[in-house]
Amino acid sequence: MTDVALIDAGGANLGSVRYALERLGVDARLVRDAAGLQGAQRVILPGVGAAPEAMSRLRAQGLVEPLRELQVPLIGICLGMQLLFEHSEEGDVECLGLLPGIVRHMTPALGIRIPHMGWNQLVPMRDSALLAGLPERASAYFVHGYAAPVTADTVAACDHGGLFTAVVQNGLRCGAQFHPERSAETGARILRNFLEMSFP
């Protein structure tokens, strides 16, 4: 993979995602405007924080429409994945609308703490090259208080007081709710799969 664009949307995990890519032998270039997307073969949208601020930053950078029109594979990570959906309850904000569904606040319950923090098991829902090479009952590291619903696009779910989307794919649009850069071999494998897999 010769040209990977890493969008700087102000997420605190930007540096750790970049380092995770470096461990895979990928020198991703930081993108802060639409011109930076030119020539990219893969685009990564990381994010930590709140959806309204992240969408405001993408708008200020002139990246909202270019991301909506992108014709190369894109993966959103953590908040970046949530931004791929139509809408988020967090701040009642319109998102990129690349995937159907509304991101909703997770509901606390007896024994269920919100935000969801820590390791949790992935529950495969359908075949996707994103999961290639993962062992059964693979786990990943999550930190989030909002979650996307399980839809026909869900590749893997996770259960924390109810199922939510952990890995998603619709054509060129992919996402991981967990932090691949903090998820050891599981995270490295999914990042590598995204970079190397063939897309329809």
Swiss-Prot record:
Catalysed conversion reaction: 5-[(5-phospho-1-deoxy-D-ribulos-1-ylimino)methylamino]-1-(5-phospho-beta-D-ribosyl)imidazole-4-carboxamide + L-glutamine = D-erythro-1-(imidazol-4-yl)glycerol 3-phosphate + 5-amino-1-(5-phospho-beta-D-ribosyl)imidazole-4-carboxamide + L-glutamate + H(+); L-glutamine + H2O = L-glutamate + NH4(+)
InterPro entries: Class_I_gatase-like, GATASE, Imidazole-glycPsynth_HisH
SS bonds (residue pairs): none
A Pfam family the protein falls into: GATase
Principal location listed in the UniProt entry: cytoplasm
Complexes and interactors: Heterodimer of HisH and HisF.
Protein name: Imidazole glycerol phosphate synthase subunit HisH
Lineage of the organism: Bacteria, Pseudomonadati, Pseudomonadota, Gammaproteobacteria, Lysobacterales
